[in-house]
């Protein structure tokens, strides 16, 4: 990101908090287009989009300079036909450019803050799989967990107001309001169907949503850090938001001593509170009693309602015992199960056999939702029976096989942390047979006849992906033993940065 700083002229514009002129730079849209090509896609590679050509970008910038011809009402369809351009396409490109500008600005601030605090940058922590080693280490020692769905703000203006704390340029914010008002139904309420999973410009909405969640999590993290570094910690400040900023001016110990007697302060001590989030779903876990979890629940609800102006019902946030509850998170079903082991001890002439029960995080492949995702994209029916992919029948044999192998490879890559691999074998079987049926349909033959002509090479390709990956990780000398041992275990990769729709079935 450092090389972009001089190229994008961000230093000169950030001195005056003025990012609006960068929208007229062609390389901003080139960066937005390059970001779209480099995304990790499971189902298909994104080809070159003719609508993103440099000619269209130049035409877009020239129309922006002629602002009296560009910004027209959404109902003026006759004017749009006379001008001869697609207004929705141009608005999408400008919003993509705006998103790139704000993202780079955020990234530069993050880099400067890391350098100021001398924090070591660890790019491996960006991986989604980096969450699971944390869960494996912490969750077996915790008792209670709560699945929390972060509510959406009721109006788009709330998101603009949140972004105002990060972007000081009023012109850019007015431009953002114009796009949201003209093209995204400004007056409608926000739901998960029409906002977060919007197909028109998901990158812009992800930026707005993440800035909204980032602000609320910043307050949550601040209060959590304050409570963890104090010997006496109470939740009194959580319920008195009006007086909170007043109270922090005075000694915290004095405030806590005045608010709560010493006999009940132990209820609020909790060094084992853990918070994990991905997209709009978060997990709150604790080793303490349900009383403290309940207090944190009401604190979150009050924080959402009073600070973020979103409505949430406390009764819909359930506190579950971790040993009896399964978490649906990041495409895995995770639960805590006892891991029994027998230890034989020899002491002189006496021997003892001891049963040890240790808790272990169990991660499973959600087979039913995953089959539903495969059925949605026409790889199988609702019962899991493979069908041919008719839309790919016009492609070459190499492209068809390569597409199926890519999906199978990425699924194996993502679900390499599963405790049991039998469910993953069924998914591979569906993809393999769907590939054969697609090829047989293209050549107007049966699966049996086509398989005899093709041989067993295709079958081997679908089941040797793990061996190929492990052979790159471990040396040949120890590969045979290592593969037999680790293939049954879990492997977490640190290069997975996003979840595709095939896995993100929620």
Curated annotation (Swiss-Prot):
Gene Ontology CC, one term: chloroplast
InterPro entries: Domain_X, Maturase_MatK, Maturase_MatK_N
Disulfide bonding pattern of the chain: none
Location of this chain's protein in the cell: Plastid, Chloroplast
Signal peptide segment: none
One Pfam family linked to the record: MatK_N
GO BP annotations listed: mRNA processing; RNA splicing; tRNA processing
Membrane-spanning parts: none
GO molecular function, one term: RNA binding
This protein's UniProt keywords: Chloroplast, mRNA processing, Plastid, RNA-binding, tRNA processing
The keyword RNA-binding appears for this protein: yes
Presence of the UniProt keyword Cell membrane in the record: no
Sequence similarity: Belongs to the intron maturase 2 family. MatK subfamily.
Free-text function comment from the UniProt entry: Usually encoded in the trnK tRNA gene intron. Probably assists in splicing its own and other chloroplast group II introns.
Name of the protein described by the UniProt record: Maturase K
Species in which this protein is naturally found: Prunus persica
């Amino acid at each position: 990101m450092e090389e972009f700083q001089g190229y994008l002229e961000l230093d000169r514009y950030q001195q005056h908090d003025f990012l609006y002129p960068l929208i007229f730079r062609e390389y901003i849209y080139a960066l937005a287009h390059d970001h779209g090509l480099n995304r990790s896609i499971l189902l298909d590679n994104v080809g070159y989009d003719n609508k993103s050509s440099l000619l269209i970008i130049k035409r877009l910038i020239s129309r922006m300079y002629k602002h009296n011809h560009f910004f027209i009402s959404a109902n003026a369809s006759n004017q749009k036909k006379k001008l001869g351009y697609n207004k929705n396409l141009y608005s999408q490109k400008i919003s993509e450019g705006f998103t790139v500008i704000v993202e780079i600005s955020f990234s530069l601030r993050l880099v400067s803050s890391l350098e100021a605090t001398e924090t070591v940058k660890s790019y491996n922590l960006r991986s989604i799989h980096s969450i699971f080693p944390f869960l494996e280490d912490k969750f077996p020692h915790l008792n209670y967990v709560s699945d929390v769905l972060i509510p959406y703000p009721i109006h788009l203006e709330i998101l603009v107001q949140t972004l105002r704390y990060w972007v000081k340029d009023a012109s850019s914010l007015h431009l953002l309001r114009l796009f949201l008002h003209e093209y995204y139904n400004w007056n409608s309420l926000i739901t998960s169907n029409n906002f977060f999973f919007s197909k028109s410009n998901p990158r812009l909405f992800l930026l707005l949503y993440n800035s909204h969640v980032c602000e609320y999590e910043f307050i949550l993290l601040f209060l959590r850090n304050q409570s963890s570094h104090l010997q006496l910690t109470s939740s009194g400040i959580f319920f008195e938001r009006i007086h909170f900023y007043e109270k922090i001016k005075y000694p915290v110990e004095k405030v806590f001593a005045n608010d709560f007697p010493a006999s009940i302060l132990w209820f609020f001590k909790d060094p084992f509170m853990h918070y994990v989030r991905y997209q709009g779903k978060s997990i709150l876990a604790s080793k303490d009693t349900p009383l403290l979890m309940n207090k944190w629940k009401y604190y979150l609800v009050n924080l959402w309602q009073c600070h973020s102006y979103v409505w949430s019902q406390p009764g819909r946030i359930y506190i579950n015992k971790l040993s009896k509850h399964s978490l649906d998170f990041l495409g895995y079903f995770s639960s805590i199960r006892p891991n029994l082991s027998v230890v034989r001890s020899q002491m002189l002439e006496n021997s003892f056999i001891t049963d040890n029960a240790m808790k272990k995080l169990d991660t499973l492949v959600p087979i039913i939702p995953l089959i539903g995702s495969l059925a949605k994209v026409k790889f199988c029916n609702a019962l899991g029976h493979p069908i041919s992919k008719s839309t790919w029948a016009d492609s070459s044999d190499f492209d068809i096989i390569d597409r199926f192998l890519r999906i199978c490879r990425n699924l194996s890559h993502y679900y390499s942390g599963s405790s049991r691999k039998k469910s993953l074998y069924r998914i591979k079987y569906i993809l393999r047979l769907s590939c054969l049926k697609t090829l047989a349909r293209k050549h107007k033959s049966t699966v049996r006849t086509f398989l005899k002509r093709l041989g067993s090479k295709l079958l081997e390709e679908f089941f040797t992906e793990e061996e190929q990956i492990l052979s790159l990780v471990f040396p040949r000398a120890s590969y045979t033993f290592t593969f037999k041992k680790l293939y049954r275990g879990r492997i977490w990769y640190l290069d997975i940065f996003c979840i595709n729709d095939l896995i993100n079935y929620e």
